Amino acid sequence: MMCGAPSATQPATAETQAIADKVKSQLEEKENKKFPVFKALEFKSQLVAGKNYFIKVQVDEDDFVHIRVFESLPHENKPVALTSYQTNKGRHDELTYF
């Protein structure tokens, strides 16, 4: 992966789901609602001074959210953080940089 360039879209992994799960409560707080479903479907990553993850998450049968999560470098010992998100996305909406 080249520093600064987002990776190609890939199917979500168990690691991706774990990252999404760590920021679920942050998104629920920002949106003031609970998501009974929170399933990571696909993702891109971007190597910066840490790593950005762009993750497409299914939050209901036909409702999707794109989240951007920042994971700091290991020596910084900081939790992952929800840095941005886009709501009202569909299953076929392309996951892009935002």
From Swiss-Prot:
Keyword Translocase attached: no
Cell compartments where the protein resides: Cytoplasm
InterPro entries, per the entry: Cystatin_dom, Cystatin_sf, Prot_inh_cystat_CS, Prot_inh_stefin
UniProt motif (Secondary area of contact) ranges: 46-50
Residues the record marks as site: Reactive site: 4
N-acetylmethionine modifications at: 1
Transmembrane region(s): none
UniProt GO molecular function: cysteine-type endopeptidase inhibitor activity
Keywords, comma-separated and alphabetical: Acetylation, Cytoplasm, Protease inhibitor, Thiol protease inhibitor
SMART domains noted in UniProt: CY
Function: This is an intracellular thiol proteinase inhibitor.
Subunit structure: Able to form dimers stabilized by noncovalent forces.
Family affiliation: Belongs to the cystatin family.
Record protein name field: Cystatin-B
Taxonomic lineage: Eukaryota, Metazoa, Chordata, Craniata, Vertebrata
